[in-house]
Regions:
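Extended, low-complexity, acidic/polar intrinsically disordered regions
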Residues: 1-848, 853-859, 864-882, 890-918, ...
Length: 960
């Protein structure tokens, strides 16, 4: 019963667990450990990794590992093996063990057992703990001793432990190196044991002399023992040692290429190819032209497809790095080698038409990378060869639905898109070829081709119109069944149509898509297409799709979610009908859009749950609502120039008051309010951007564009009306040169440039303020409204999930009770934290460090009411810590010299690999009560009694 309870504790994924839950789960597992049945004990042991995953803080982990150490000490070998597996699975939690000495003491006691299997398990356990006990001399001694054992199981365990400690400890590696060398070269050591000892040498890289002696030994082994297993193990260890020490990589490249070229054994060649690929990834800058040339010559002459594929994989890795430029650079100071005459290009061209699809795919990768990075001269023919190679591979694979053909097709399409981004003049013919192949391909190939067409059309929108006719014709006959591939094809084709249409769908296109959706599409497919329509700005169509799918869901939260999306699409659709110069129409459209947005935000709030709070979505929509209200207010303010122009004495008032803004009348004050409002909105967009650590790049760029639009309007208000003399357009001049990644970004950039040009020309020609200035502002508002808002991926889908869990100590006994501390002492606040990831950690950005900000504020004062310096009322400390294995810990010293209750706030933020700080939270608060120390309290009482002493003395004597 206890284990089922523990299982229920560990399987629930609920929010806001109390510490009692962790203790209860540990107690239930402890009952299982103390059970008399071996099965229950084993089940309890294997549940510990889940416990560590759910409650990853040191206090619990320390207690749990001590209990496991007891089981290891007292149990049988099977239980010890279970504990060993748990320890190896929980490697990243080992450093959280607080009582390392006690834990190791209990484990180490088994090393003196008479059972060699028990000793072997203990050695493996010590090896698994090497990261936290790298310099334990008793462990070092036991490992050295066990290497001389006559039991094979114990010796193998000692080799595992020795390898683990060698990787962690320089002293152990230096001490064990000679013994390992003697054993490897000893005649009485079996060959099987030598093969297990040799890989230990890859860890001998702690200093140059150790690495050099290990390399000499490996060189001796390679020359002295030519058998295939020995050569393979020695060469691979050689490569690992070179990759770790870095200084011997050029020599290792020559050695591997020599074996690849001269050794006839296929297994040795395969090992050499794999190691060359490892070094190509590790240090491509160390590959000189001769190395690449030898590899090309081997690939041209090798008769085995598997080895040719491996060599091409190495060349594909190198061709995307600096090594390709070194290959085509000057040779001996002579002229440049013509690219088409080199062996590398010949090999790639030959492989593009190879019968093996994988070989052909790698040939295309190499040829594409060469065409992109090659010098400009002699490139035309190379480009044509690359395009022909890609097209032939596409024709070969597009009608084959096998996994290998689809993988090859994906590689070829990726290379094609990469080439077209670098060489746009090749795009037209490539798009025509893809459209022609679409009609002849199988469904899975069509999906991949649609992805490629969408990428090309996004980069080159001018090609969109030419695609549309073929795509719509294909959509009419695209689906005849409801299989998964057919549904995927409907979504992919619709996405390309949306990209090609550039947010303006014709009635015919809508009819064709809707007809197909009604015939064969399921609800999920309809939702995905609607989502893509919202992303591409086709809001009228997405609104219709959300309307038809929202009644087909089983949860009310999903119903409210779809209802909110429908309202948002309707709101944006209202704004799409705004006409240039129609200011009253713009205000009416904004009012209509705001009504839909208010309905939508109510539904969105109802759709949120504790598991899915929709924080980003709610904040983004609130900002959109406030932005529309600010734009509407700006139009009203511009119109007020007509209803209440500056009075006749405005100039006199301005001269008298010394405020030039008075010359414009009351509109100047209203414009200042508008400018401040837009700057406030820009700051809120910046905060939203800074809190969206898990968002994809397109979503973050979208938020940036919203922020820039607010800053643009505030700048134009200042430049046209408030301060024309000081306004500068220099810093905004390069906004159009930024490389755009989407149609929405392209259109927003175009609007930004147009508005800035109009404002700059008007500032030079006319003094403020006139109807020309207000018309310019209103035109800017309408231009921004006419760009359909894009709802990017993070609004619908969260691909990366990162959260931080904090624990503070000391902690209060109850949540409402403050922590007592004397005012003459400092409180040591320990902050521990765990970084928790979703299924794909680090997809967009990774955490480099965590920034902890601790502040304290005096809430209520209990001491004398005299004036207190401000710096003694608060603490403010900031510290940056780097998490290790997703765990971090640090301490703060806080001073509470003022008597009373203080609120201490600990806020966490993360810093990514680029050094950008993200306000991810969380924020934790704890109350601290500063008490007067007893000695000061006694002195104060004595002083009080001394000041009022005569009267009490008289009364005392009279009573006696």
């Amino acid at each position: 019963m206890s284990l089922s309870t523990a299982r229920s504790f560990l399987s629930e994924a609920c929010y806001g667990e109390q510490e009692l839950d962790a203790n209860s789960a540990l107690m239930e597992l402890d009952k299982g450990l103390r059970s008399g049945k071996l099965g229950e004990q084993c089940e309890a042991v294997v549940l510990f990794p889940k416990l560590f995953q759910k409650y990853p803080f040191p206090i619990l982990i320390n207690s749990a590992f001590l209990k496991l150490a007891d089981i290891f000490r007292l149990g049988n070998n099977f239980l010890r093996l279970c504990v060993l597996k748990v320890t190896q699975q929980s490697e990243k939690h080992l450093e959280k063990i607080l009582n390392v000495d006690e834990f190791v003491k209990r484990v180490f006691s088994v090393i003196h057992s008479n059972d060699p299997v028990a000793r072997a398990i203990t050695l493996r356990m010590l090896g698994s703990l090497a990261s936290i006990i790298p310099e334990r001399k008793n462990a070092h001694h036991s490992i050295r001793q066990s290497l001389d054992s006559h039991d094979n199981v114990e010796v193998e365990a000692a080799i595992f432990a020795a390898a683990s400690f060698s990787a962690q400890s320089k002293d152990f590696a230096a001490g064990i190196c000679n013994k390992v060398s003697e054993m490897i070269q000893g005649l009485d050591t079996p060959v099987e044991l030598k093969l297990k000892l040799i890989p230990m040498l890859q860890h001998m890289h702690h200093d140059a002399s150790l690495a050099s002696s290990s390399r000499e030994l490996l060189q001796h082994l390679v020359n002295s023992y030519p058998s295939t297993p020995m050569v393979i193990v020695s060469l691979h260890t050689f490569t690992q040692l070179a990759a770790s020490s870095l200084i011997d990589i050029p020599k290792q490249l020559q050695l591997l290429l020599q074996y690849l070229k001269d050794d006839p054994r296929k297994a040795v060649k395969r090992l050499a190819v794999n190691d060359l690929k490892l070094l190509a990834k590790k240090a491509p800058h160390l590959w000189i032209r001769e190395n690449t040339q030898v590899l090309c010559e081997c690939a041209l002459t090798i008769p085995y497809n598997s080895l040719k594929l491996g060599m091409l994989a190495v060349l594909a890795t190198l061709s995307g790095t600096i090594a390709i430029k070194q290959y085509f650079s000057n040779v001996g100071g002579g002229s440049l080698v013509p690219p088409r005459l080199t062996d590398l290009v010949k090999l790639a061209q030959e492989c593009c038409y190879h019968s093996n699809l994988a070989v052909a795919a790698h040939g295309v990768i190499v040829l594409t990378n060469i065409a992109i990075s090659c010098p400009e001269k002699d490139i035309v023919q190379l480009e044509q060869d690359t395009v022909l190679g890609v097209e032939s591979l596409l024709m070969l694979c597009s009608q084959d639905s096998s996994p290998s053909a689809q993988a090859t097709l994906k590689t070829a399409l990726t290379s094609l898109v990469k080439l077209l981004k670098s060489r746009p003049h090749l795009s037209q013919s490539a798009v025509e070829f893809l459209l022609g192949q679409l009609h002849l391909s199988c469904d899975s190939s069509r999906v991949l081709m649609c992805h490629a067409l969408a990428a090309i059309a996004t980069h080159l929108p001018v090609l969109g119109d030419g695609m549309l006719g073929d795509l719509v014709d294909l959509y009419r006959v695209a689906s005849h069944s409801s299989t998964d591939k057919q549904q995927e094809l409907l979504v992919s084709l619709a996405t390309v149509i949306f990209v090609a249409s550039q947010s303006s769908l014709s009635a015919e296109v809508k009819t064709v898509i809707k007809q197909q959706l009604e015939n064969v599409a399921n609800g999920w497919t309809v939702y995905r297409i609607a989502r893509q329509a919202s992303r591409m700005g086709c809001h009228e169509f997405s609104s219709e799709l959300y309307q038809c799918v929202r009644t087909r869901v089983a949860s009310e939260h999903f119903y409210f979610w779809l209802s909110s999306l429908k309202e948002f699409s309707q709101a944006e659709q209202c704004l799409s009908h705004v006409e240039d110069g129609d200011y009253s129409g713009a205000m009416s459209a904004i009012a209509e859009a705001l009504r839909s947005y208010q309905k939508g935000i109510a539904s969105l709030t109802a759709a949120s749950t504790p598991l899915s709070p929709l924080t980003f979505q709610c904040e983004f929509i609130k900002l959109r609502i406030d932005t529309l209200q600010a734009l509407s207010q700006l139009i009203c303010t511009c119109n007020s120039l007509k209803t209440s122009p500056p009075p006749a004495i405005a100039t006199t008032i301005a001269l008298t008051s010394g405020n030039e803004l008075q010359r414009c009348g009351r509109i100047s004050m209203q414009m200042k309010v508008c400018m401040d409002e837009f700057r406030s909105l820009a700051a809120r967009y910046a905060d939203l951007h800074q809190s969206s650590f898990d968002a994809d790049y397109a979503t973050l760029r979208n938020v940036e564009l919203q922020q820039q639009s607010c800053l643009l309007v505030s700048h134009v208000i200042e430049a046209l009306i408030l301060d024309p003399q000081a306004a500068s357009f220099q810093e905004y001049g390069t906004v159009g040169s930024v490389q755009t990644e989407s149609e929405y970004e392209r259109r927003m950039m175009s609007v930004f440039n147009h508005v800035l040009e109009e404002a700059e020309s008007l500032t030079k020609k006319h003094p403020p303020v006139s109807h020309l200035h207000t018309s310019c502002l209103c035109d800017a508002v309408i231009a921004l409204l006419k760009v359909p808002l894009s709802f990017q991926r993070y609004f619908f889908q969260k691909l990366q999930s990162t959260s931080i869990k904090l624990a503070l100590s000391p902690s209060p006994r109850t949540p409402s009770e403050p922590i007592p501390v004397q005012n003459t002492q400092q409180l040591t606040l320990k902050v521990e934290g765990v970084v928790q990831h979703g299924s794909t950690p680090g997809l967009f950005r990774k955490i480099q460090s965590v920034c902890l900000n601790v502040t304290s504020v005096l809430q209520s004062k209990t001491g004398p009411d005299y004036k207190i310096p401000l710096d003694t009322k608060t603490n403010e400390i900031k510290q940056r810590v780097e998490p290790h294995n997703d765990y971090f810990s640090t301490q703060f010293l806080l001073n509470f010299s003022i008597l009373g209750t203080h609120t201490v706030t600990v806020e966490a933020s993360v810093v990514d690999e680029s050094g950008i700080e993200w306000k991810t939270g969380p924020k934790t608060t704890v109350s601290v009560k500063s008490l007067e120390d007893p000695y000061s309290q006694q002195l104060r009482h004595q002083l009080q009694q001394g000041g009022a002493q005569p009267a009490p003395q008289r009364s005392t004597y009279t009573r006696f």
